[in-house]
């Protein structure tokens, strides 16, 4: 599941890996408030500030930004004169500006990435993520080859029930692998 931090980093076009960002978010003691999110953005060397917008004037803000909406936080992706597009818990939502202003508390976190804004040890984390992906694909390929060879050698698909039972067992192995 994408976290608020990884969603915001994606919208800011910051080089990051989901595994590091999600782990940082999960382990941060203040992950559900603006202080915590600000602290996490500082790890990525992103200048940021929490602000209170008087009269909820959205024109004062440049997207993307994090907004406090209905006791939760959302990442506002873009705004127009008619609508506000934001991401809330991995759901992309578009609402009229007036409706958004009713939901919004006027509190926002704005960020200004610089040239040095990136994940600490990004290359190392990216390489680790790539190795993990290759390992998963390799295991799946080996299982498929073994399945094909085994079914050919032992005629596993000669009956419908044999094939069905094999499919159920493989589905169980797949679920436990995830």
Model regions and ranges:
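Contiguous, structured surface segment used for ligand recognition
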Residues: 1-2, 30-60
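Membrane-interfacial helix-loop segments of redox and metal-homeostasis proteins
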Residues: 139-178
């Amino acid at each position: 599941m994408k976290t608020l931090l990884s969603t915001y980093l994606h919208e800011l076009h910051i080089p990051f890996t989901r595994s590091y960002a999600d782990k940082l978010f999960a382990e941060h003691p203040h992950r559900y408030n603006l202080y915590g999110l600000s602290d996490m953005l500082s790890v990525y060397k992103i200048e940021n500030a929490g602000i209170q917008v008087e009269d909820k004037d959205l024109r004062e803000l440049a997207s993307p930004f994090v907004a406090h909406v209905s006791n939760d936080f959302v990442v506002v992706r873009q705004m127009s004169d008619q609508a506000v597009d934001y991401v809330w818990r991995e759901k992309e939502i578009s609402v009229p500006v007036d409706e958004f202003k009713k939901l919004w508390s006027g509190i926002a976190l704005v960020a200004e990435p610089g040239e040095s804004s990136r994940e600490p040890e990004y290359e190392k984390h990216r390489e680790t993520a790539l190795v993990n992906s290759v390992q998963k694909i390799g295991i799946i390929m080996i299982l498929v080859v073994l399945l094909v060879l085994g079914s050919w050698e032992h005629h596993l698909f000669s009956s419908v029930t044999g094939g069905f039972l094999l499919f159920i067992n493989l589905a169980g192995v797949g679920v436990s692998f995830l």
